[in-house]
Amino acid sequence: MKKITAIIKPFKLDEVRDALQEIDISGVTVTEAKGFGRQKGHTELYRGAEYNVDFLPKIVLDIVVDDDKCDKACEVITKSAYTGKIGDG
């Protein structure tokens, strides 16, 4: 057995879950998290004032799979979570 931990963008969760179900992986633990990497946050406007948002919302997926499914699961997660933008990891 192997444990896979993946950090993805929140809006990709359904797509990743569906892709995992297609390869018969249905047990996933989902945790909401905040973090930053090269993105370093962003600025938002709220009621006329600017605020720095240092931490960006993320989703942490923890998945335990049989050894023979590990490579395929990692490939499926990588492909289905891909956006082509900074923060993909």
Predicted regions mapped to residue ranges:
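Positively charged, small/polar-rich N-terminal and surface patches that mediate targeting and assembly
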Residues: 1-89
